[in-house]
Amino acid sequence: MKIIILYLTLLGGICSCDLQEKETTYISNLDRTLQSKVTFILENKLSELNALSGQAIIMEVQTGQIKAMIGLERKDSANYQLSENLPQTQTLGLIQPISILAALETGKVKLSDTVNVGNGIYSTNEVEIKDHNWHRGGYGTITIQQGLAVSSEIAVYKTIEKAFGSEQAYQAQLKKMEINLDSLNTLEMLTLYNDIAKNGDIANKANTDSLKQALKYVVTDGLGQSAKSEKVQVAGKTGTLQLENGSYIVEFCGYFPADNPQYSIIVSINKEGLPAAGFMAGEVFRQIVDYMNK
């Protein structure tokens, strides 16, 4: 089955997104005070990690207006500088919820369904899939929601396999949701999550609501706990990806308040060394949320 090839290379974009046109509108709505604070928060975390670069974007949910957009890259061992030329590759972890939403749209799966991910290693005719904890014996039998919370690639793949059965059916559903499989940059990924947050036209409202409950669970019980705020409930997803040069992209994308979203945020950090899942990006997300709710 070729679904796995499509899933593992799911770096898709939104068909209707004219990025250049939207950038002009977004930039004119920047909140300079917020922009300055987010720059401070991001730079502190990058310095702490000695990271190569980082990005943070804040979007107003209902209007889609960008309130802050920062890109920083390492200038030398102690300083960072503003940059627009940053990695745009999106992590599989952030794409997982989109794949799950597509599967929910078929009516063939629900988040409470169980899936056996075994010892964390799953072989198909095309490739061997490994969950991040395979060396600890895997997660065994878990629900789809739990699989999403722990970023189980096996759980998401098996969910896609059950829901669609063929690559053609999977692509057809993504096309129906106006998601294309070309290149998805950081701003477009945030736009996609923002559409989920406001119950946009991406999917049936009941399925979007189910996914939003799952994204809350990611933060309360899954790998997104570093994004948890004491001031307001948040929802979102972590992601990690190793680049060809050996460095890692770690990300968190989410929104708040979870039950009445006002703002969505994406944080992306490019660093060398072990990634610690999306924890580092989640911490930046939390600090931004806390500042905006002080």
Please place each PLM-identified region on the residue numbering.
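Short, basic/aromatic recognition patches
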Residues: 39-48
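Short, conserved phosphate/pyrophosphate- and ester-handling motifs at nucleotide-, phospho-/glycolipid
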Residues: 96
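A helicase ATPase "motif cassette" and its flanking acidic/Ser/Thr-rich regulatory loops
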Residues: 38, 147, 285
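Bacterial Sec-dependent signal peptides at the C-terminal "C-region" and cleavage site
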Residues: 2, 10-23
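Surface-exposed helix-capping loop/turn segments at secondary-structure junctions
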Residues: 47-50, 294
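Short, gly/Ser/Thr-rich active-site loops of penicillin-recognizing serine hydrolases
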Residues: 282-294
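Beta-lactam-recognizing serine transpeptidase/beta-lactamase-like catalytic domain environment
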Residues: 22-25, 30-34, 52-92, 101-271, ...
